[in-house]
């Protein structure tokens, strides 16, 4: 068993960060009138663990006993059978950013809300809970349909929605929910968890090992635990996927050398297809590329234009287009920007200029004194 599964918090007292959000959820669950809830935060911030504890506060530990149930979905022209995880008290739905999500949500929620369970009265709750993960994957029409469905079944159901990016959720849907924004853990929190797991697993970490984990985890606790797991197994934490992203970034930067652009673009497309088959979302691919490119390009104007290309591509992705089309639009825009500015000197922001100006003045004073 992987460490991040083995050491997942079993009790609320085991949760070491974002304890203020946990206290607010516990207080909210103690009231009779529980609102719809949105929990938003980046990957690795503990959103799923918070949802688990919230369900235990609402009902009891029986919510962790899950089983699969099949639902028949009738779309506009197709019929599907989908397996959904559920307990006696709640159901878990994960949208897949397809055109069928609207019908999946409507049909599953309708069938689940109509099904009465007498076990629910043990907890004195008059409602069941519907948990929806990755709600930002829903298109605008699906989110509008979900809002209408929430209003229809408000007496018998409560909705807990989880997302990475709150800005992708339409305002009419957000206005009907109580929102909790969950930040990433601090380096101190991650260091505490890593030291605890290393002690329990008898893994000896020196200062360089700890520094490597903390510097490369990007404040993502799951990534840090994965690095520790690889250290315990004496294997490299960097997988082929990371190498594929690095190859794409190197190929994009190579266009500044004046080499064959068409060959570079074909190499990039091959690596992007290799990344896409791992089932990573297009928006996540663009975000990773933006982060890696900005770290390597020392020009504030180019970096600003890269972010603009990324925002346009990510906006188009939310409208249900093919991921590869918008990813290639982003990459082509970045390559065009680099080619047009390859002979220009890098431009700095005002803060950077002021810092360099101060350094030059202090150096000149030293030379005068000498």
Curated annotation (Swiss-Prot):
Listed name of the protein: Putative replication factor C small subunit L478
InterPro entries hit by this protein: DNA_pol3_clamp-load_cplx_C, DNA_Rep/Repair_Clamp_Loader, P-loop_NTPase
Alphabetical UniProt keywords: ATP-binding, DNA replication, Nucleotide-binding
Function: Part of the RFC clamp loader complex which loads the PCNA sliding clamp onto DNA.
Annotated SUPFAM superfamilies: P-loop containing nucleoside triphosphate hydrolases (SSF52540), post-AAA+ oligomerization domain-like (SSF48019)
Gene3D superfamilies: 1.20.272.10, P-loop containing nucleotide triphosphate hydrolases
Compositionally biased intervals (Basic and acidic residues): 342-353
Family of this protein: Belongs to the activator 1 small subunits family. RfcS subfamily.
Biological processes, Gene Ontology terms: DNA repair; DNA-templated DNA replication
Annotated region (Disordered), positions in chain: 342-370
Binding site for ATP: 41-48
GO molecular function list: ATP binding; DNA binding; DNA clamp loader activity
Composition-biased stretches (Basic residues): 354-370
